[in-house]
């Protein structure tokens, strides 16, 4: 499966010891059971969808803007935690290193309210399509199981370009599957008609 990215707009939190700089920073990367309109179809992530990926103990990175050279933490180093919270949503925290200029800059931007969104990169193991009032047949995609989680990121801008490209690609595959299914049904109808004509002729 192709790697995809999604962004959630919400509060990026931080915890401080006394009046000093935050000792831990984090946010919500994904909200479950909430329908998102991606412009080509609707999408919802089911509660429990992240359990499979998190059970693998994969080394998930916390990056700034999904940039590999702007690493904020990683789970194997115990400088980042990625987990499902009490609401079933995907949450993450990371421990800033204030000797690192990137960390200092990101934390200050979060404290000022300049960064309020989080994103995550993932692949899908199990999904299904259903009817959507807005997009019609197979217009709603339900993500049931996430295969892998690669990184979580506080982001300056939502990953709109990546998300739109993902949505276009997924919609194209969906449309192709619909055409194949329609062709199969058409062929099946033709076969039934031939059989009926043959029976009528023999009769």
Predicted regions and their residues:
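Terminal short linear interaction segments
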Residues: 175-203
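Signature of dsDNA virion morphogenesis modules
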Residues: 1-177
């Amino acid at each position: 499966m192709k790697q995809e990215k999604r962004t959630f707009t919400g509060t990026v939190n931080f915890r401080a010891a006394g009046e000093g700089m935050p000792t831990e920073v984090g946010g919500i990367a994904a909200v479950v059971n909430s329908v998102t309109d991606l412009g080509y179809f609707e999408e919802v992530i089911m509660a429990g969808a992240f359990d499979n990926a998190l059970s693998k103990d994969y080394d998930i990175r916390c990056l700034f803007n999904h940039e590999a050279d702007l690493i904020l933490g990683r789970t194997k180093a115990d400088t980042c935690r990625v987990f499902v919270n009490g609401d079933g949503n995907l949450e993450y925290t990371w421990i800033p290193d204030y000797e690192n200029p990137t960390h200092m800059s990101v934390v200050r931007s979060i404290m000022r309210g300049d960064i309020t969104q989080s994103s995550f990169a993932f692949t899908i193991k199990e999904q299904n399509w259903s009817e959507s009032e807005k997009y019609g047949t197979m217009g709603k995609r339900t993500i049931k199981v996430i295969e892998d989680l690669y990184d979580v990121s506080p982001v300056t801008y939502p990953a709109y370009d990546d998300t739109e490209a993902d949505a276009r690609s997924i919609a194209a595959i969906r449309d192709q599957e619909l055409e194949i299914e329609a062709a199969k049904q058409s062929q099946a109808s033709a076969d039934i008609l031939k059989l009926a004509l043959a029976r009528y002729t023999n009769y």
